[in-house]
């Protein structure tokens, strides 16, 4: 019985059928102006001409525009003829098809273009037990936030859970309630009057209680944030400033009236600068260029006119309200909108808008020419969208007021009460949706209204934040059912945040469209059993919101389902134009230059960010240590021919040139292990055969440079498309593991130098000694050293020597406190371990600080960007304060060659025989493969689609720069540098850009990488200047740099699918994450794929760690062939999920053919919306009127045309299917 009663209450007095159209409101004044319309004009005015939406494919669908009823008037007989032509409104079997049709239509105006929505729900309640007021109880930007019952605070954002019953009740409300679409009103008073008039006319509301309902609707709105701002000093803030950050740029240009038209109205209308120029009392102005206007009326297409009060459309104006006139507002010129001026009052903020600087002179001149003076009379401060410019220009457009100056909450904007922190989270151009629900004692049955305003209007005081209101939902009912009304309000608010219903609400033409949107939403709803889920539990927002595109894709024209249910995958990383073979000499290089040249200046402008400074400091510290370490190892291997200073100079020179001119400046160059192995083998060969090492190395380097340039000329970089994820991840994982291994190895190596004494006897600590003594069996080298220093063993006071002096004279340490390399050094090793792991964990913690709950967002973001640099500074300071002598970074202090016998220019021949110039081509071939593979695999990893790079890649240009600088370094006797995988990945990770404007509860979206050249350029410039910064760099402990290596290696492993698949070996199936490839590939095949990849990784590790490391690039190349063999064990569908499909020449041709056919199909559909053009033989073109096409969801469109072949006078038939 209770349910029946509730249903009876929901049923209005005057029932209406579901086929009845919603009221398309023509504005407040349409009911008051005595304008007579013919019956046929009224019918044609409401007619909507629907173009049939014919889907050709999922990617490209022809959309027919709705013809606006304002411009096309047709008689009823025209509609009958349309039916005879076969242009019928399509029938839809499901709400989903109806919704897809609605979303597939486009409108000529901007009033139905969807915007982001902020939804607020207010409930009518008592305040202090005395009077009613609307109190904000919930809001939605992306997820729901509620005002907590027990405290004045907002809840955490959560996923809204709705009861199914409330959704059905909402559907009943839309079905039986008042629906008014495209209402033109400027104040809440006008909206209330029009809604109530419609309710009375339809019998939903009794005229006797009209004033009671109107009074309830116009009650004050109390927002949650107002208490926090009561004690704050009012802010003096201009609308222009607000508009820069939070308003829609299209708001100024809505319906064809742009900023230029507004400036024209400034010049021809009233002069807004009079006040400031004449020095009058400060007043608050709203200029015409902030007022969105509607279409029509004027030659420019705008309808912003100076309203003229008439007895028919406005009550008596208050003394404080006057209208502003100018000479330009009388005849045919566009009339300036009425500008209302507020008095100098304390409770209204002063908002002063200054005209653009370029218009000041024009305004001054116009002011002198004006013959009529404009009088400014204090009045109400109108909101930007509540001015009468929103009303129809063909009708009266008077600001609604009353004797007391109108409703203040609807006419003033107090920015001192605006929560600007929340305002920043609202996207640009957002509009508001207000939900008003409540219970009153004078109603016997609920009244419901759904209103869509056109255009959106800023109703001050109605919404928590000053954004224009687009939708209003009203539900007032008798007392006793407040929870029911609350749930219905939550339902409509949640629906407005749904991506599909949100678009339907903007594009709906009648009530049925809204009902279809609700039905489609119900089709997608998941119901949880009440006994298995507690609805009071708040669901945390997901990290990533699933895409709703599948709900927008219509079924195939013949009603069949797609062949595969697999979700669409993004294009492979090698599908871009950068790796397509041109067939011309240096063709790929020329295209790279053309592609990157337009971005050259922006590569420097885009670096104006604090994030780039953090990246420079981080990567500088990260690059310094491996370069110096590599130089030291190279110095040991070549007996000082090439050492640390050459390594620093070579890295700086190569890095600067590469950062300036390379195709992908995000890549960081560095030294590699195979290059070091090659240098060792080459030096040993030259020493055994008495050849000049530097000269032979120069010859090999020049040959390598030449061969790399040949690869550039022949577009060999296009072969990179055969390097799939399988090869990339094996190579990247190996480099990351090497970084981790070498960081730990260096830490253990410190244990050999700074050994610690084990198994100590604490009682015998006072007897532990370690002194220097004469070596018992001095070597020949030691004797020669003594002779050079003119000393003998007997003349040296061994017991009095310091540790360094004892090592200089090759003394021997004797005593119980002595280790293998000297006395035990207390605490150094353990302190190094503390520095090492503290650096790693602190860097990781600070990098993730962006997601913590402490401090403002800007502070967290800055700490995250400077994470590694802050860690280094903190650890250096702690090390300095503790004072334990940990090993420090050693940088050469002089800029000169390590070997005094060599210079900065090396001859390719030198003392070597002439034939060495020719034989050098053989090892150069091996070096070419090494350089090519290292460079291009790293480039492929950097240019992956996951990084969302927008400026394109430049594989050919990258290889050219590496080749040129390799030749330069060879001539100068400097080490060779190539792309460093881990450093490049760390560089990219440090420049990730995420969305700043995110709704509460929504995770920031990854937008891409800050692509620029400055970070790499500054890193290598600082590296070259390091020789002059030794006084600062000498304080950096080496364990801290080793900890940075560990952090880079571990952080670079994130996102590698290979390691995610390795984790699956130890997980039961029920605990495995919902990885996409596990849905489509059997688990045992995933394990087989992982085992093969792991085996290849182990083989690469063994080869790289052995003396055969010089053939390491050949083994990386072999991975491509291993991947090709996997086609025999896996299907292409499985490999498409586990890896990228290998490119095939036949597949490319077929793909090109499909693309060409698609372009042809799109070209056929170009032109006006009433004709389809089909090419025919001998250049003929068939034109088919769209109205002859009949669409049925069960079968494809088929058109048969008879036409005459002119030359042969024969009749032919042509048939096409769409």
From Swiss-Prot:
InterPro entries according to UniProt: Band3_cytoplasmic_dom, HCO3_transpt-like_TM_dom, HCO3_transpt_euk, PTrfase/Anion_transptr
Phosphothreonine PTM sites in chain numbering: 1171
Keyword Cell membrane (UniProt): yes
Keyword vocabulary terms for this entry: Cell membrane, Cell projection, Disulfide bond, Glycoprotein, Ion transport, Membrane, Phosphoprotein, Sodium, Sodium transport, Symport, Transmembrane, Transmembrane helix, Transport
GO biological process, alphabetically ordered: auditory receptor cell development; bicarbonate transport; camera-type eye photoreceptor cell differentiation; cellular response to growth factor stimulus; cochlear nucleus development; locomotory exploration behavior; phagosome acidification; purine nucleotide biosynthetic process
Modified residues (Phosphoserine): 57, 60, 89, 155, 238, 247, 386, 404, 407, 411, 560, 1180, 1217
Residues with glycosylation annotation: 176, 274, 410, 780, 790, 800
Region annotated Essential for cell membrane localization and transport activity, chain positions: 1012-1135
UniProt PTM: N-glycosylated.
Residue ranges annotated as motif PDZ-binding: 1215-1218
NCBIfam families per UniProt: ae (TIGR00834)
Any one Gene Ontology molecular-function term assigned to this protein's record: solute:inorganic anion antiporter activity
Gene3D superfamilies, sorted: Helical hairpin bin, Mannitol-specific EII, Chain A
Induction of its expression: Up-regulated in kidney upon metabolic acidosis.
Family: Belongs to the anion exchanger (TC 2.A.31) family.
Functional note: Electroneutral sodium- and bicarbonate-dependent cotransporter with a Na(+):HCO3(-) 1:1 stoichiometry. Mediates the sodium-dependent bicarbonate transport important for pH recovery after acid load as well as for regulation of steady-state pH in the duodenum and vascular smooth muscle cells. Plays a key role in macrophage acidification, mediating bicarbonate import into the cytoplasm which is crucial for net acid extrusion and maintenance of cytoplasmic pH during phagocytosis.
TM segment ranges: 613-633, 642-662, 700-720, 730-750, 822-842, 866-886, 913-933, 959-979, 1016-1036, 1039-1059, 1097-1117
Spans within the Cytoplasmic topological domain: 634-641, 721-729, 843-865, 934-958, 1037-1038, 1118-1218
Reactions listed under catalytic activity: hydrogencarbonate(in) + Na(+)(in) = hydrogencarbonate(out) + Na(+)(out)
Activity regulation (record text): Insensitive to stilbene derivatives.
Biased composition (Polar residues): 383-396
Region annotated CA2-binding, chain positions: 1138-1140
Primary localisation category: membrane
Name of this chain's protein: Sodium bicarbonate cotransporter 3
Tissue: Expressed in aorta, ventricles, atrium, mesenteric artery, kidney, spleen, duodenum, jejunum, ileum, colon, lung, trachea, gastric fundus and pylorus, cerebrum, cerebellum, pancreas, liver, parotid gland, and epididymis. Expressed in the inner ear by cochlear outer and inner hair cells (at protein level). Highly expressed in testis and spleen.
């Amino acid at each position: 019985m209770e349910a029946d009663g509730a249903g009876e209450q929901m049923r209005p007095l005057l029932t209406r059928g579901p086929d009845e159209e919603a009221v398309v409101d023509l504005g407040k004044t349409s009911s008051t102006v005595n304008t007579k319309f013919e019956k046929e004009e009224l019918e044609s005015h409401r007619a909507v001409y629907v173009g049939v939406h014919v889907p050709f494919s999922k990617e490209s669908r022809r959309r027919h525009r709705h013809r606006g009823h304002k411009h096309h008037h047709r008689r009823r007989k025209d509609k009958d003829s349309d039916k005879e032509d076969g242009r019928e409104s399509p029938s839809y079997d499901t709400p989903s098809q109806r919704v897809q049709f609605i979303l597939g239509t486009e409108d000529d105006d901007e009033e139905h273009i969807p915007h982001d929505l902020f939804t607020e729900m207010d409930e009518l309640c008592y305040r202090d037990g005395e009077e009613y007021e609307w109190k904000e109880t919930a809001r939605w930007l992306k997820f729901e936030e509620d005002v907590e019952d027990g405290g004045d605070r907002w809840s955490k954002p959560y996923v809204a859970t709705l009861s199914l019953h409330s959704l059905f009740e909402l559907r009943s409300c839309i079905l039986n309630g008042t629906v008014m679409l495209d209402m033109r009103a400027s104040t809440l008073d006008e909206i209330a009057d029009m809604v109530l008039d419609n309710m009375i006319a339809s019998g939903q509301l009794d005229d006797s209680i009209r004033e009671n309902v109107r009074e309830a609707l116009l009650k004050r709105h109390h927002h949650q944030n107002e208490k926090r701002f009561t004690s704050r000093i009012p802010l003096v803030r201009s609308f222009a400033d607000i508009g820069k950050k939070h308003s829609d740029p299209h708001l100024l240009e809505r319906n064809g009236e742009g900023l230029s038209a507004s400036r024209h109205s400034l010049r021809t209308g009233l002069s807004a600068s009079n006040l400031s120029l004449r020095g009058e009392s400060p007043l608050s102005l709203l200029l015409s260029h902030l007022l969105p206007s509607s279409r029509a009326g004027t030659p420019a297409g705008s309808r912003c006119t100076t309203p003229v009060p008439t007895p028919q459309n406005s009550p008596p104006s208050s003394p404080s309200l006057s209208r502003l006139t100018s000479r330009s507002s009388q005849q045919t010129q566009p009339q300036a909108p009425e500008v209302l001026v507020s008095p100098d009052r304390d409770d209204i903020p002063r908002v002063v808008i200054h005209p653009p600087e370029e218009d000041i002179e024009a305004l001054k001149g116009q002011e002198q020419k004006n013959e009529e003076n404009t009088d400014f009379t204090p009045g109400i401060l109108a909101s930007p969208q509540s001015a009468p410019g929103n009303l129809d220009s063909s009708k009266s457009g008077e600001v609604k007021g009353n004797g007391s100056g109108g409703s203040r909450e609807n006419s003033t904007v107090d920015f001192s009460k605006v929560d600007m922190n929340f305002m920043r989270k609202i996207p640009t151009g957002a509009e508001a949706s207000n939900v008003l629900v409540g219970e009153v004692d004078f109603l016997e049955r609920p009244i419901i209204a759904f209103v869509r305003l056109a255009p959106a209007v800023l109703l001050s005081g109605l919404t928590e934040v000053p954004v224009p209101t687009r939708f209003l939902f009203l539900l007032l009912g008798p007392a006793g059912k407040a929870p029911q009304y609350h749930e219905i309000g939550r339902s409509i608010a949640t629906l407005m945040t749904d991506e599909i219903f949100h678009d339907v609400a903007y594009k709906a033409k009648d009530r049925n469209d809204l009902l279809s949107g609700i039905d489609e939403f119900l089709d997608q709803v998941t119901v949880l059993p009440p006994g298995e889920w507690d609805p009071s539990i708040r669901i945390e927002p997901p990290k990533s919101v699933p895409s709703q595109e599948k709900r927008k894709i219509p079924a195939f024209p013949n009603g069949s389902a797609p062949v595969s249910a697999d979700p669409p995958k993004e294009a492979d990383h090698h599908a871009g134009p950068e790796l397509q073979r041109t067939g011309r000499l240096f063709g790929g290089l020329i295209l790279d230059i053309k592609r990157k040249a337009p971005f050259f200046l922006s590569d420097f402008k885009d670096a104006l960010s604090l994030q780039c400074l953090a990246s420079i400091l981080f990567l500088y510290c990260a690059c310094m240590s491996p370069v110096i370490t590599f130089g030291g190892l190279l110095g040991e291997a070549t007996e000082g021919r090439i050492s640390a200073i050459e390594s620093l100079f070579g890295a700086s020179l190569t890095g600067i040139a590469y950062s300036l001119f390379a195709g992908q400046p995000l890549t960081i160059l560095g030294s590699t292990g195979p290059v070091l192995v090659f240098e060792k083998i080459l030096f040993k060969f030259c020493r055994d055969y008495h050849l000049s090492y530097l000269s032979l190395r120069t010859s090999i380097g020049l040959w390598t440079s030449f061969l790399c340039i040949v690869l550039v000329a022949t577009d060999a970089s296009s072969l990179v498309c055969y390097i799939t994820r399988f090869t990339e991840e094996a190579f990247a994982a190996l480099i990351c593991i090497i970084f981790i291994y070498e960081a730990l190895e260096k830490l253990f190596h410190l244990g050999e130098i700074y050994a610690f004494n084990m198994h100590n006897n604490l009682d015998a600590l006072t007897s532990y000694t370690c002194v220097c003594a004469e070596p018992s069996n001095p070597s020949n080298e030691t004797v020669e050293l003594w002779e050079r220093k003119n000393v003998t063993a007997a003349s040296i006071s061994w017991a009095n020597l310091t540790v360094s002096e004892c090592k200089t004279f090759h003394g021997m340490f004797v005593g119980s406190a002595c280790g293998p390399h000297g006395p035990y050094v207390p605490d150094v090793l353990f302190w190094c371990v503390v520095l090492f792991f503290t650096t790693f964990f602190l860097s990781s913690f600070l990098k993730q600080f962006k997601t913590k709950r402490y401090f403002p967002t800007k502070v967290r973001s800055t700490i995250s960007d400077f994470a590694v640099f802050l860690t280094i500074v903190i650890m250096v300071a702690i090390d300095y304060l503790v004072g334990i002598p940990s090993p420090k970074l050693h940088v050469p202090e002089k800029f000169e060659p390590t070997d005094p016998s060599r210079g900065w220019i090396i001859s390719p021949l030198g003392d070597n025989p002439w034939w060495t110039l020719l034989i050098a081509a053989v090892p150069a071939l091996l070096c070419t493969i090494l350089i090519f593979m290292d460079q291009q695999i790293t480039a492929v990893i950097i240019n992956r689609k996951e990084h969302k790079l927008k400026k394109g890649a430049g594989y050919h240009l990258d290889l050219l720069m590496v080749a040129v600088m390799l030749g330069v370094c060879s001539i100068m006797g400097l080490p060779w540098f190539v792309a460093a995988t881990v450093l490049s990945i760390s560089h990219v990770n440090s420049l990730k850009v995420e969305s700043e404007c995110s709704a509460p509860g929504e995770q920031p979206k990854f937008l891409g990488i800050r692509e620029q050249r400055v970070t790499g350029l500054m890193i290598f410039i600082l590296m070259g200047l390091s020789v002059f910064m030794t006084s600062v760099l000498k304080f950096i402990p080496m364990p801290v740099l080793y900890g940075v290596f560990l952090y880079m290696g571990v952080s670079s492993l994130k996102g590698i699918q290979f390691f995610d698949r390795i984790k699956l070996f130890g997980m039961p199936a029920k605990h495995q994450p919902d990885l996409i490839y596990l849905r489509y590939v059997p688990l045992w095949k995933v394990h087989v794929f992982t085992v093969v990849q792991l085996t290849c990784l182990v083989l690469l590790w063994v080869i790289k760690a052995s003396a055969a490391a010089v053939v390491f690039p050949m083994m990386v190349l072999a991975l491509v062939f291993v991947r090709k063999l996997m086609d025999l064990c896996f299907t292409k569908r499985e490999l498409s999920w586990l890896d990228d499909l290998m490119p095939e020449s036949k597949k490319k041709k077929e793909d090109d053919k499909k693309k060409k056919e698609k372009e042809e199909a799109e070209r056929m559909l170009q032109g006006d919306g009433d004709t389809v053009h089909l090419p025919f033989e001998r250049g003929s073109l068939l034109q088919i009127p769209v109205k002859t096409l009949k669409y049925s969801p069960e079968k494809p469109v088929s058109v048969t045309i008879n036409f005459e072949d002119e030359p042969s006078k024969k009749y032919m038939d042509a048939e096409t299917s769409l």
